[in-house]
């Protein structure tokens, strides 16, 4: 988000099984929204004592002023080039990021 943490800030993450992304909403101590960070990942798996997913590097940020920005495409590209993420999975991550970006 590019903002400094302040005492009393709260981050709330909303995980839903099977979704290819999850948002974390950041608020100040007085409840003012400081921004939302949406992580793109493999489908979220929820178990009784843990949550599992693989981060796919690309993310979408909605700043407090309402501007939306897609970030870390370069990290995804680097992961593909290094052989850590297959191209087909990277393409799905890009599609998900684009859909989230449009929805925000």
What are the functions of these language-model segments?
Residues 1-104:
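Acidic, polar-rich N-terminal leader regions of halophilic archaeal proteins
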């Amino acid at each position: 988000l590019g903002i400094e943490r302040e005492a009393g800030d709260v981050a709330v993450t909303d995980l839903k099984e099977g979704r290819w992304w999850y948002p974390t909403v950041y608020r100040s101590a007085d409840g003012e929204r400081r921004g939302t960070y949406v992580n793109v990942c493999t489908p979220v798996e929820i178990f009784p004592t843990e949550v599992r997913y693989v981060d796919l590097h690309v993310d979408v940020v909605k700043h407090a002023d309402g501007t939306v920005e897609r970030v870390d495409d370069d990290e995804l590209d680097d992961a593909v080039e290094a052989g850590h993420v297959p191209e087909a999975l990277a393409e799905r991550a890009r599609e998900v990021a684009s859909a989230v970006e449009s929805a925000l």
